[in-house]
Amino acid sequence: YVNLGQYQEAAADFEMGLRIDPKNWDCWYHLGLSYHLMGSYERALKAYETCYALSPTDEYRICTTDWYCMTLMKMGRIDDMRKAASRIHADMEPGMSEGYFDRVLVYNGTRNIDEVLAEAAAKDDHMYATGAYGLAVYEEYVLGNREKAKEILTRIAGRDETWGGFAEHA
């Protein structure tokens, strides 16, 4: 349902899955995503907090922290976002969460936003969207630069080879 844009139905499915297996990391992560995409940010935060606690490796902690931070940004809770981002550090192993990793390192001040955007631009469309979307959120909600955020989002939309990722939905 998430990929169809039916976020309420997706949340209902993930909630049902959690009744069956309350420690299912994937259900918690995608429940948080569903709530985030519906604009139910408080509920998204709670799902991501549980998801983070269940995260078995850096790879899982990184992607969970990224969506948690974006949720906090959209809520205007910038100090809380910086605190959450600080738990991710450059010597972690990102695995498949590389795009999330680089942007969380921007959120916590370890990496430069322009460098990360340039690196993301060299990747395929899906990985560009993954790397750039959170930086657009950061530009708008943290730096107050709505025009630059809009430029990033326009570039994401203009790279139309793949459209299956969560950044494209957000």
Predicted regions and their residues:
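Structural marker of alpha-solenoid helical repeat scaffolds
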Residues: 20, 54-57, 159
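Register position in tetratricopeptide repeats
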Residues: 3, 37, 74, 141-142
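Residue-level recognition of tetratricopeptide repeat
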Residues: 33, 70-72, 137-138
